A protein has these predicted regions:
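Short, small-residue-biased leader/transition segments that mark boundaries at the very start
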Residues: 1-6
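Active-site donor-binding segments of glycosyltransferases and PAPS-dependent sulfotransferases
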Residues: 32-107
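Catalytic donor nucleotide-activated moiety binding site of glycosyltransferases and closely related
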Residues: 139-146, 178, 219-221, 225-262, ...
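Membrane-proximal helix-turn-helix segments that form the acceptor-binding/catalytic region
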Residues: 152-167
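A short beta-strand/loop micro-motif in the catalytic core of glycosyltransferases
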Residues: 165-172, 277
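Donor nucleotide-activated moiety binding/catalytic core segment of transferases
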Residues: 187-195, 199, 246-247, 251-279
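A donor-sugar binding/catalytic signature common to diverse glycosyltransferases
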Residues: 269-309
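Leloir-type glycosyltransferase catalytic cores
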Residues: 312-360
């Protein structure tokens, strides 16, 4: 089952959780190691540049962007390649649909993390719809479209691609509605794989606890207001601010900078934080797993429904901050007895749906 091969800690942890869950259910599985030519190295930087209006004004600006970002992109790519090899069971490297067609399995499964959303170039990739699979069963667990604003033409194309699946369960409640709109049968909304494992289970991966009290920020999107709010919030509660990031350019955004930690340390920073500020779906998921007092800043793009969906499920919409002058959320503690009860029931329900998909 393919997962987006991005330099993203959450995606990597989601893949680990999926493998762990399937193996516990008695299955052997591998992650399809698929990499698009335009999503790595210099090509990824150039593709990203097309979406950066600030840098695309003239040739000099474009060159400056490439010179600044390429070394960072290359380093992150090498680090994540090493982590994928360390933590995941991978197939052979696949770069084309012909490579994908040579793979063999009893069941092909689409994973999570915006697999059915746009790629870096703004278009969807049929590989993530398992279009290369012709005579084997196809299922999807916690598949994510990432957004909701699809044209009628795109939805029509999606319907053709999804009609060959024998079973589908999705991660967001909005995706359930979109599938119904396409007349595609859906088993329902399920938990992201990272939430199928408990905080105690994830803690076994941690090698050392981070000492002291601190505010942690994990930010994926370019949002200056979030960066300023994190600094203001840390000052308000009188604690140091730590910033963990897989991208080096965030060093300018405030706080003690922790660049691309290994997964055990990344989890430890979240687990041991006093407060946790994030715009990341998987950041939110691990805040829930570790029962952290978190503050949610919704992404300033079209993918915020991912975060909103899990907050609605756990009835924690009040953790969303929109007034960046207001730090009073620091005084409102989350009732994790209630939240953990919701997650416990949802784990049981989601695992039941996954077992059903595998049996169909």
């Amino acid at each position: 089952f393919p997962t987006r091969r991005s330099s993203d800690l959450g995606s990597l942890l989601q893949s680990i959780a999926t493998i762990t869950t399937l193996e516990r259910l008695g299955h052997k599985c591998e992650i399809i190691d698929y990499i698009r030519d335009d999503e790595h190295g210099l090509s990824a930087v150039k593709t990203n540049l097309n979406n950066k209006q600030r840098w695309s004004g003239n040739s000099l600006k474009k060159l400056a962007y490439i010179v600044l970002r390429y070394p960072e992109e290359k380093k992150a790519e090498l680090n994540f390649r090493e982590m994928r090899r360390k933590y995941l069971k991978l197939t052979q490297l696949c770069r084309t649909h012909d490579d994908l067609k040579r793979l063999d399995a009893d069941i092909f499964m689409t994973g999570s993390d915006q697999v059915w959303g746009p790629t870096l170039n703004g278009h969807y990739d049929e590989a993530y719809f398992l279009s290369f699979v012709k005579d084997k069963r196809k299922i999807a667990y916690a598949a994510s479209l990432g957004r909701t604003d699809f044209t009628a033409k795109i939805l029509s194309e999606y319907k053709k691609l999804l009609s060959s699946y024998s079973g589908i369960a999705v991660r967001e409640n909005t995706a359930v509605g979109l599938l119904r709109q396409m007349d595609i049968e859906c088993a329902g909304q399920v938990l992201d794989p990272t939430l199928l494992l408990t905080g105690d289970e994830w803690s076994r991966m941690i090698k050392k606890d981070m000492g002291g009290k601190y505010v942690l920020v994990y930010q994926l999107h370019n949002n200056p207001a979030l960066s300023k709010y994190a600094v203001r919030f840390a000052e308000h509660v009188g604690l140091p601010l730590y910033r963990v990031s897989p991208t080096f350019h965030q060093i300018r955004r405030g706080g003690k900078f922790i660049y691309l930690p290994d997964l055990p340390d990344f989890l430890s920073y979240i687990k041991n934080s006093t407060y946790f500020i994030t715009d990341s779906f998987h950041g939110t998921a691990f805040a829930l797993n570790f029962n952290r007092q978190f503050i949610e800043i919704l992404p300033n793009n079209k993918t915020g429904n991912r975060n909103q969906s899990i907050l609605q499920l756990t009835r924690l919409q009040d953790r969303i901050v929109t007034d960046y002058a207001d730090c009073s959320i620091s005084e409102r503690m989350i009732d994790y007895e209630r939240v953990n009860d919701i997650l416990r029931k949802e784990r049981i329900r989601s695992l039941g749906i996954l077992k059903q998909l595998l049996r169909q």
